[in-house]
């Protein structure tokens, strides 16, 4: 199962967002399908909480109208990027509410949810509750100035807004009022031993995730799971369910979305129990993809919720209504994609929206850039100069030129894939290189090393270009047998390289498949489908689903068929104007030196 962090539905998403949750998860999922594994890739829009209400006020919409608006925008953009979700849904469905409440009740029955009187942050100007993440100040532990009210991204410690030094609202900069209020808490202290033991076994995670988990084990204290709001999942307890201004905290219901989306997917496929193969089968593997600001929720809180439901916390308890659910196997967290050294920010105007980018450059250029030059292990600055260089040199000159030269010459001289005659050592050496790359590239992808995987695939492309330049088939008119052997070798390696690059470049991979005479679906794309809510039929919304079982791409070198008709190619990737690297498009923010 590929569980992808849920984009927040308070506005369109920018390329910094999809560099963390979007492209890496799809590259991984496409590879796993090609390798013959059953994959369930799920996510959706996160639609509850104060930020939705605040943005709705700004736009003069109701909270539901705003959620509907950006749910559609985000769904359309992720479809355009080619993210192959088995289900991309939303958190305002009847199915999600039911699943969240059932897991809440299981945790409550097992004693992992407790009431506490606490201090809540209120905006003096609006009277509205401020979510912890919307309060910023100085961390009392490490002194970091940009700590949030829920955690410090610098030291990884969990915080309470009232603990911050000089706390201010991130919405309008005012100092919040702190008032007493009663809330429900997830008793994380009741998972100190069980969760700590589990985290100690996660030695293979990325270093940035392991850094945070070390602090998590030392800071296991109760964490609020309710808020004074009227927009969210109702609390299914006597004395709470009828309170109009008490709802489950957005972070609590959002992480449960991975499971509720799996249940919804199963219901929509006509087999309501299909989710069990990914959640209760001990052999199933769960991979979670996100940006680094979500590590705590996935490495500490979500495992604790699952343990509490399963009766596996320090207090024990009964197994919940869904059976014993699997804990995460891998948490794949990316760092931040920045611009001019700063995080992408809508409020500061440092933002490149996915929709704008796709309209001008198409999906595969962005997918490739994020894969080979994105923030896999450290914060990475996006520059137009680097983007133009990668597109022009690697995609257009290297990969596009290899496809064009190989297919054009074979189509012109033979009209079809020529038969190899008397292959030489150089031919076999190149074919061996491309065959062996499947194990190397696949190994990197299995370990979520996307940069290394893309670079290794491009090494095959570079070797094939050198081979063509060395063999000079355009000079072999008087030796057609040798020319055909060279062109057959080149076409075979183009076919292999196209397979190796398919997880990164699924749209152009389909085109190369067809240029090589292939028919049918090589690399399937997600479909936007209009559906009715399974539990509230009068509500309709868009989802992403797809028929990925129909695609032909498989993770192996397949011998190219002699005599297969070839088609005259058109450029795979258009070269970009070098001046674009200096200024970027007119609609893009100006880079600061």
UniProtKB/Swiss-Prot annotation:
Binds 1 zinc ion per subunit. It catalyses: tRNA(Met) + L-methionine + ATP = L-methionyl-tRNA(Met) + AMP + diphosphate. SUPFAM superfamilies: Anticodon-binding domain of a subclass of class I aminoacyl-tRNA synthetases, Methionyl-tRNA synthetase (MetRS), Zn-domain, Nucleotidylyl transferase. Its cofactor is Zn(2+). The keyword ATP-binding applies. Pfam families: Anticodon_3 (PF19303), tRNA-synt_1g (PF09334). NCBIfam families: metG. Is required not only for elongation of protein synthesis but also for the initiation of all mRNA translation through initiator tRNA(fMet) aminoacylation. This is Methionine--tRNA ligase. It comes from Saccharopolyspora erythraea (strain ATCC 11635 / DSM 40517 / JCM 4748 / NBRC 13426 / NCIMB 8594 / NRRL 2338). The gene is metG.
